[in-house]
Amino acid sequence: MIGLIFGETDFPKYIHKKLKTKKKYTIVDLTRGHVFKKDRNSYSFSIGQFGKIISILKKKKCKKVLFAGKVHKPNFSKIKFDLKGLYYIPRIIKKAKLGDAALLKEIINILKKEKIQTISSTSFTPELTLTKGNYYTHRPDKKDQSEIKTALKHLKRSNQYSHVQGAISRNNHVTLEKKGGTQKMLKMS
C-alpha cells in the first residue's frame, strides 16, 4: 500500500490516473477544493492535522508515501492543530522560514521517524524525466561552458542548510535561488 499526499496542480491527477488500476493506495488530499473526494480511498485533511494524517497512513499500512502537487503555505496562526501537529509545529515553522525545500525535508524526516519512507514521484512516472544530455539544437560554446562551471561552483559552495536549488550565471554574475523561489531568482538575473 502506498500513501499519496496530494496538493494542487495537475501532476497529482496524472499520478492518480496512472496508479488507479495498478497499485493499492491511500490518498491524503490537501487540496483546497478536495479534488479527490470522489475516490473511496481519499481522506481530506488540513495541513495542521499531522497526527491524523500519520495515523491514517499507518492504519492503511502505508510503508511508503509519495508527494505530488503544490500545498499553499498556510497562515499558521489560523490553523487548527491536533496533538501531533502541535508537537511538530515549532520545527515546521522554523523550516518554513528557510524555504520550501527545507520544509519538505523536515516533513520527510518526521515521516522517517514514524517509519514511513518517502519515494520519488518519478518512480511511477519515468516518462516525465529526462536523461542526461543536451535537449536543444544549440550546443554550449566555450563562454556558455564557462558560465555553467561558474554556476556549478557556486552551487557546490552552498551547504545543505542553505537549501539552494538553482543558479543562473550571466557575465560572471551568479544569482542563486533562495527562499524567494525560482520566479524571484529569474527576475533578479
Question: Which residues make up each language-model segment?
Answer:
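N-terminal basic/disordered segments at the start of proteins
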Residues: 1-30
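Conserved mixed alpha/beta catalytic, RNA-binding, or beta-rich assembly cores of soluble enzyme
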Residues: 8-11, 44-47, 97-101, 107, ...
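N-terminal beta-loop-helix "entrance" segment that forms/cooperates
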Residues: 29-51
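Short, high-confidence coil segments that cap the C-terminus of an alpha-helix
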Residues: 62-63
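Short glycine-rich anion-binding loops that position phosphate/pyrophosphate groups of nucleotides
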Residues: 70-73
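A charged helix-plus-loop insertion that forms the helical arch/lid used to bind
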Residues: 77-97
